[in-house]
Swiss-Prot record:
InterPro entries found in the cross-reference section: AMP-bd_C, AMP-bd_C_sf, AMP-dep_synth/lig_dom
Region SBD2, annotated ranges: 351-413
GO molecular function annotation: ATP binding; CoA-ligase activity
Keywords: ATP-binding, Ligase, Nucleotide-binding
Lineage, top ranks: Eukaryota, Fungi, Dikarya, Ascomycota, Pezizomycotina
Entry protein name: Acyl-CoA ligase inpC
UniProt-listed Gene3D superfamilies: 3.30.300.30, 3.40.50.980, Luciferase, Domain 3
Length: 583
């Protein structure tokens, strides 16, 4: 059975297949595309992109229609800044490919990606410049270059680190404005479907085929993929938003696909996007009051922190907020209920997506919701479910591995043909590795299928022959006031086959007076009051200071599981990963 978007949804416009991203954005909403900050005057994005492209062309000897795009790979290794997107679009303007690198990535991982792509040019910021220079030297690339992006907090300050002669993007733009115009991109019909725009690192939280270095795969995302997803998401929200623009909070890293697509999406539809260099809770809350922000794009751990520390929301005026969009991790109904109690006027809109789908697959319509679900498929997406026996699911409310088709799906993984073959089936469907269910509602006379992600396929455990999803336990524990963060993995058990094991970061302010054993007892009562026996934890709870995490903040469950495997089989206390420790 093929599951599709709601039949009542609006019709999607044709997706341009022969235009680069920056041309598509400027063509649609040039009146909105301004680069504004309190430190420098407003300039059109188009002007800045073109001037930077001219400078890069002169500096590097590149031109838009000469040479392979793979000979013009440029990395961006920086925290968020207004010129992050300007730099990426300037790279596209001269026919190049932009490789994203997360600021928390190790030097070894960045070096591996540079060697894989033969990248010799990096955009970075002053705080990351030493690492960037170290990697460029260690990679032994010819004629390495590093250019500096200014972060808001760095503007007007004396640099704490020497620049070592690197030019800033602002200097390049100023110089480029005086240079002759460069030729327009001359693309063949349909070239946008083949031309890679971004190389995006995947999260790798399950450790699938990863080495000890945990080098992430690079998803090849084309111009067509990004443009398609902009149109898909905007079309779906055209009904609820009725063409109205919003002021949105943006602190999600642009180096991660979720943050990247949101920045493109809000730019195209004309929203105001208040960009933060990095996440800081107090700064984010203050900006809500200052800019009267209406929409928050959050991830579940941040929502959990707000729910467990509600006093934070009283530090500033947050009355302007009307909606919270959440993704990049499971968001259970218990956490939604907890947020609703703290801020009942905020409408929570869960969604689902992957780096490999660039990015958005489902969005919640604020008028038609299903508690605990992840929204409806956006236009252009098709889905299938394959059950544990390898058979296709032919009904609603039956779980199976989610397979997808969408115009936004990547070309594949760079340099990893085996991984690419494994992630696509023989008919070209993307295997997500997520277990999902489609559920129907009939609100307002509209029959609506809702996507509900149950768990990661490889994270599902079997307890006494019954399938148990860690996300169910996690969502219950996340709603407990003493829990700041939680990750549940399956461990071997002689009697049941497997049992759930919870790693928990305690909230520093709530129930802090309880000793560990008393809190474990309270957590067990919390779980056992609502979940069946296969979900119970009993002694399988351990408190830690922090989790090993991926670059986008997801707990690395495979590291937690590795630390437990040997010790749990011997019925001894499990070892804690290197970057965690007991309370």
């Amino acid at each position: 059975m093929i599951f599709t978007p709601p039949v009542w949804g609006p019709e999607m416009m044709a997706i341009p297949a022969s235009r680069p991203i920056h041309e598509f954005l400027v063509e649609r909403d040039s009146r909105h595309l301004y680069d504004w900050s309190e430190e420098k005057p407003a300039l059109t994005i188009a002007d800045r992109v073109d001037a930077l492209a001219r400078s890069l062309g002169r500096e590097l000897g590149w031109s838009p229609n000469t040479g392979s795009p793979w000979s013009k790979v440029v990395g961006i290794f920086s925290f968020n800044t207004l010129d992050f997107l300007v730099a990426s679009w300037a790279i596209h303007r001269i026919g190049g490919i932009c490789m994203l690198m997360h600021p928390t990535s190790s030097a070894a991982e960045i070096k591996r990606h540079i060697e894989l792509t033969e990248c010799r040019v990096l955009f970075t910021c002053r705080s990351l410049l030493p690492t960037a220079n170290e990697v460029l030297v260690a990679s032994k690339v010819q004629d390495p270059r590093a250019y500096l992006l200014d972060l808001p907090e760095e503007l007007g300050r004396k640099p704490s680190l020497p620049d070592q002669g690197q030019q800033t993007v602002e200097q390049l733009i100023s110089a480029g404005a005086t240079l002759p115009l460069i030729e327009a991109l001359d693309w063949a019909e349909g070239q946008g479907k083949e031309q890679v725009a971004y190389l995006c690192p995947t999260s790798g939280t399950s450790g699938l085929q990863e080495s000890a270095l945990t080098v992430k795969k690079l998803a090849m995302i084309t111009h067509y993929n990004i443009i398609a997803n902009i149109i898909q998401a905007t079309t779906f929200e055209a009904g609820p938003k009725k063409g109205r623009t919003e002021v949105a909070l943006g602190f999600l890293p642009l180096s991660h696909s979720y943050g990247l697509i949101l920045a493109h999406l809000t730019a195209w539809r004309g929203d105001t996007y208040i960009l933060h260099a990095r996440f800081d809770m107090q700064a984010a809350l203050a900006s809500i009051e200052k800019y009267r922000i209406e929409r928050l794009y959050l991830v579940p751990p941040i929502i959990s922190a707000l729910v467990n520390n509600p006093f934070l929301l009283d530090l500033c005026d947050t009355s302007s907020v009307t909606s919270v969009v959440t993704g990049s991790g499971p968001f259970g109904p218990r956490l939604a209920e907890a947020l609703s109690r703290v801020r009942p006027s905020w409408q929570v809109l869960p969604g689902y997506g992957l780096t490999e789908t660039a990015v958005i697959i489902s969005i919640t319509d604020p008028n038609i919701t299903y508690p605990g679900a992840d929204g409806c498929l956006v236009p252009g997406v098709e889905a299938r479910l394959i059950n544990s026996n390898g058979n296709e699911v032919e009904a609603y409310n039956e779980p199976g591995e989610l397979l997808l088709k969408s115009p936004s799906i990547m070309k594949g993984y760079l340099g990893q043909e085996t991984a690419t073959r494994e992630v696509f089936d023989e008919q070209g469907w993307l295997r997500t590795g997520d277990i999902a269910v489609f559920r129907l509602t009939g609100q307002d006379g509209k029959v609506t299928p809702h996507l509900d992600i149950v768990d990661r396929k490889k994270d599902i455990m079997k307890v006494k022959g019954l399938q148990v999803a860690p996300v169910e336990i996690e969502s219950h524990l996340a709603a407990h006031p003493a829990v700041a963060e939680v990750a549940v993995v399956g461990v071997r058990d002689e009697d049941a086959g497997e049992r759930p094991y919870a790693f928990i970061v305690r909230s520093p302010r709530t129930m802090a007076d309880l000793d560990e054993e008393a809190l474990k007892a309270d957590l067990n009562r919390h779980v056992e009051a609502t979940l069946s026996e296969p979900h119970w934890l009993r002694k399988n709870i351990r408190f830690v200071e922090e989790f090993p995490k991926s670059s986008n903040g997801k707990p690395l469950k495979y590291k937690l599981k590795e630390s437990l495997a040997t010790s749990y089989a011997r019925k001894t206390s499990p070892a804690i990963p290197n970057n965690t420790r007991n309370r």
